[in-house]
């Protein structure tokens, strides 16, 4: 079983890892309404801040089986962050609410997973869909042969030219 859980209650992927946007180093999970954001695994908050691009953002460092991972949760609802730098969080703990802050064109969670520490070049980014599952069952952090599949992939539409912004699928 995967060591990382889905960071929100929707698995609707509106923009995948890289794909048509090679500089998109995470996945976008989106759905209208109120959606809490959860820590994908237990760890220590490395950053909890407001970024011009990520908006309301939290980064968490995890050490799993001696390996360092870092998760990024971006575009959270204004004022919804419930943790600060240095806090220890447990897997599934609510850390905020899905929103539309920063460089964003609609409510969604931009979620990144890095094998190693996050860096500005995002050279450690891996596709989160290869590692997400239903929880910590003492298994592995290696990609699953059959990762939990997202719902909602369809035809992409975007208000931005050349694929900029999040893609909304119908």
What are the functions of these language-model segments?
Residues 1-56, 65, 91, 100, ...:
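Surface-exposed, glycine-biased beta-strand/turn segments
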Residues 32, 38, 48, 67-92, ...:
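Short histidine-centered loop motifs in beta-beta connectors
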Residues 44, 74-81, 129-135:
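A short, sequence-level motif marking secondary-structure junctions
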Residues 1-12, 121-151:
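Intrinsically disordered, low-complexity
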Residues 56-62, 69, 87-139:
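Conserved, short, structured surface segments that act as functional micro-motifs
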Residues 144-170:
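Cell-wall glycan-active module
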